[in-house]
Curated annotation (Swiss-Prot):
Organism encoding this protein: Mycobacterium phage D29 (Mycobacteriophage D29)
Taxonomic lineage from the root: Viruses, Duplodnaviria, Heunggongvirae, Uroviricota, Caudoviricetes
Record's protein name: Gene 2 protein
């Protein structure tokens, strides 16, 4: 099969596995309304208090995230590289039955369908490396890093921080898709100045996001699955076995050991 056919076949398996845990429409809608309410409230208050700052901040957040995505590498951590290479793809929680984040398939299905709608392909969770920043606290997800090809960035939504752990303050989105309204503005609203240029305000928010990423991470949710053909290179943070490197060599996937 060519990559498109493989992706479609793998995605069908992922959707079928997730559908076994899908919530009712009523639960999905209620959860979506709840999570959007968490972030809408502070934005509505800001708009009432200072509509000019509201517009300036929303634009600056969109611009800053656009800049980050233009230079970022999407990086997925794994503990199961051997299984991934054998299967040809990254499998979802619904297929493997467990998550490093500790949530159950039922909990994950509720959140994902509230965020992305019913019938979506389960996203693959990763982090962004950009401008010399490498996410902290990611070892729990695995010591092997998969650097994905640049075109994968076109298929991501993002959150500032962990989407599950911070679901009361963020909601996945992308620039131009309401991102500015999907993260609590209170911590950064005073970083922008309506009297300054668009570039200056963008840079202020960019530096804030970068500082956050230096001690935490910006999460990316990759849509439409991840297959071997999406991998640009594999980086080991610990010395790998020849068993794994031989597999990578056979598949033609570049690899290196992080210094």
């Amino acid at each position: 099969m060519d990559p498109a056919q493989k992706r479609a076949a793998f995605n069908a398996l992922a959707v079928a596995a997730r559908d076994q845990h899908s919530p009712s429409d009523a639960k999905r809608i209620a959860k979506r309304d709840q999570m959007l309410g968490y972030v809408r409230g502070p934005w509505e208050q800001l708009e009432d208090d200072d509509s000019t700052r509201y517009d300036t901040l929303k634009q600056a957040m969109d611009d800053a995230m656009s800049k980050i995505l233009s230079q970022a590498q999407v990086v997925h951590r794994t503990k199961h590289l051997d299984k991934l290479l054998d299967s040809g793809r990254i499998s979802s929680l619904f297929e493997v039955g467990f998550s490093a984040g500790g949530d159950t398939p039922g909990q994950r299905a509720l959140y994902e369908e509230a965020w992305f709608g019913k019938g979506h392909v389960p996203p693959v969770y990763s982090a962004l490396e950009f401008d010399g920043v490498k996410p902290k606290g990611m070892s729990m997800y695995g010591s092997t890093k998969l650097y994905l090809k640049p075109e994968v960035r076109d298929r991501v939504t993002v959150t500032i921080g962990d989407s599950l752990m911070s679901s009361d303050s963020v909601f996945p989105g992308k620039p131009g898709d309401g991102l500015g309204l999907r993260a609590n503005p209170n911590a950064i609203k005073n970083l922008v100045d309506p009297n300054k240029s668009r570039e200056e305000n963008m840079q202020a928010i960019y530096e804030s996001f970068k500082k956050y990423a230096e001690s935490n991470f910006i999460e990316s949710q990759i849509h439409d699955g991840v297959i071997l053909e999406d991998i640009e290179k594999v980086v080991f943070t610990q010395p790998p076995s020849s068993f794994l490197t031989d597999k990578l060599d056979k598949l033609g996937i570049p690899w290196e050991v992080e210094s």
